[in-house]
Amino acid sequence: MSKQDLIEMEGTVTESLPNAMFRVDLDNGFNVLAHISGKIRRNYIKILPGDRVKVELTPYDLTKGRITYRLRKK
């Protein structure tokens, strides 16, 4: 699967789960289970409940995703 097939959305982290998993409420109202991408994990970027994040979803399973970016707070 190429990067063109991925669906990228923004959302808010609502819950932190074990093993670097997070529950994210997307802007369109859906709720997904997301894990952290390797670059965020490698650079020790902390993600807390309430943070705005970018999530990549595959068209095959829209209930799971990957957090690729933590948006800055305004």
UniProtKB/Swiss-Prot annotation:
Task: List the GO cellular component terms.
Answer: cytosol
Record domain S1-like: where? 1-72
Q: Which subcellular locations apply to this protein? A: Cytoplasm
Tell me which UniProt keywords the record has, alphabetically. Cytoplasm, Initiation factor, Protein biosynthesis, RNA-binding, rRNA-binding
Q: Name one Pfam family in it.
A: eIF-1a
GO MF annotation terms: ribosome binding; rRNA binding; translation initiation factor activity
Q: How is the subunit organization of this protein annotated in UniProt?
A: Component of the 30S ribosomal translation pre-initiation complex which assembles on the 30S ribosome in the order IF-2 and IF-3, IF-1 and N-formylmethionyl-tRNA(fMet); mRNA recruitment can occur at any time during PIC assembly.
Free-text function comment from the UniProt entry = One of the essential components for the initiation of protein synthesis. Stabilizes the binding of IF-2 and IF-3 on the 30S subunit to which N-formylmethionyl-tRNA(fMet) subsequently binds. Helps modulate mRNA selection, yielding the 30S pre-initiation complex (PIC). Upon addition of the 50S ribosomal subunit IF-1, IF-2 and IF-3 are released leaving the mature 70S translation initiation complex.
Q: Which family does it belong to?
A: Belongs to the IF-1 family.
- Which PANTHER family does the UniProt record give? TRANSLATION INITIATION FACTOR IF-1, CHLOROPLASTIC
Which protein is depicted?
A: Translation initiation factor IF-1
What organism does the UniProt record list as the source?
Nostoc sp. (strain PCC 7120 / SAG 25.82 / UTEX 2576)
Query: Quick one: which gene encodes this?
Result: infA
